[in-house]
Amino acid sequence: MTYFPPAAEICDSPRHDWSIPEVLALFELPFVELIYRAQTVHRQHFNPNQVQMSTLLSIKTGGCPEDCAYCPQSVRYSTPVKAEPLLPLEEVLTAARNAKARGASRFCMGAAWRRLKERELEPVAKMITEVKALGLETCVTLGMLGPGQAERLKAAGLDYYNHNLDTSPEFYGEIITTRTYQDRLETLSQVREAGIHVCCGGIVGMGEERSDRAGLLANLANLPRHPESVPINRLVQVEGTPLAGAPELDPFEFVRTVACARILMPASFVRLSAGRETMSDELQALCFLAGANSIFYGEKLLTTPNPTTDHDQQLFERLGLELLFPQAQVAAPVPEADEVGSASG
């Protein structure tokens, strides 16, 4: 097995040069050893008993022209999801107020678009401004962006932009053909250049190999800056999509993925995203032990079910977890230590 240094040696500074063999060596560690290393890294950057809560609202559901094999919002598949218009501003604000009242500190708005069109930018910008005025962090996922659009979203008060890599470059073509991996990387670059925080992760349990999970995490960690938020989604199978009936991912492998994400991106929030509704409390507890410190809160994630808010509150009480409330006014991304050194040198 490839040698991997003790946890104390891997927390000193963030890395952006991970190889697939190195990440696979992490995955292959004995389970308890891997969890120990992840928890050690986690404690160097976070209070291990605090979890940040976000709420995700679909502001434009269905009708997407892309062919993501996991997504019930694609027009290419016969699913229960039907195309709907953009939600009115007041409906979005009502959802945001309710989310804040239940303990969410970040409000995420998702639209089933291939890319943000100019005619939709102004109403979305208004939503961002009004949600931020409520004292919440703001996040959107709107697809690819055109020239100058990221800057205009930033000016409206946007804190985070979500754009996932989904999986490894090698497996990517099995999941989507209507958007390239490079398209995704270019969108992330636009977001960074505009001074917006990046939310970027992927989906596991789509029939990929462990090497693909390692490849996804390596590509995330090797970005010029680590994403501030890393959502780890476990596939929610929806009848009518090509991935309905995909083999279930072993629960311990999911925990290993969370632990490796924590080690590779030590200062990022690692979020348990889609798929929590089918996770046992024990599995979620293992994920928190492995370094997950954020969840999506609320009974629906875009179009898929999520645990009830009462259930999440009870789980937090049983585990002694506290809510983390970041400042609502999020500053521009601060360079990582190694970037400061290279810039000044």
Curated annotation (Swiss-Prot):
SUPFAM superfamilies: Radical SAM enzymes. Pathway: Cofactor biosynthesis; biotin biosynthesis; biotin from 7,8-diaminononanoate: step 2/2. Binds 1 [4Fe-4S] cluster. The cluster is coordinated with 3 cysteines and an exchangeable S-adenosyl-L-methionine. Binds 1 [2Fe-2S] cluster. The cluster is coordinated with 3 cysteines and 1 arginine. It comes from the Bacteria. One of its GO terms (molecular function) is biotin synthase activity. Its EC number is 2.8.1.6. [4Fe-4S] cluster binds at residues 64, 68, 71. GO terms for biological process: biotin biosynthetic process. The keyword Metal-binding applies. Residues 49-276 form the Radical SAM core domain. [2Fe-2S] cluster binds at residues 108, 139, 199, 271. The keyword S-adenosyl-L-methionine applies. Catalyzes the conversion of dethiobiotin (DTB) to biotin by the insertion of a sulfur atom into dethiobiotin via a radical-based mechanism. HAMAP family: BioB. Homodimer. Belongs to the radical SAM superfamily. Biotin synthase family. This is Biotin synthase. It comes from Nitrosococcus oceani (strain ATCC 19707 / BCRC 17464 / JCM 30415 / NCIMB 11848 / C-107). The gene is bioB.
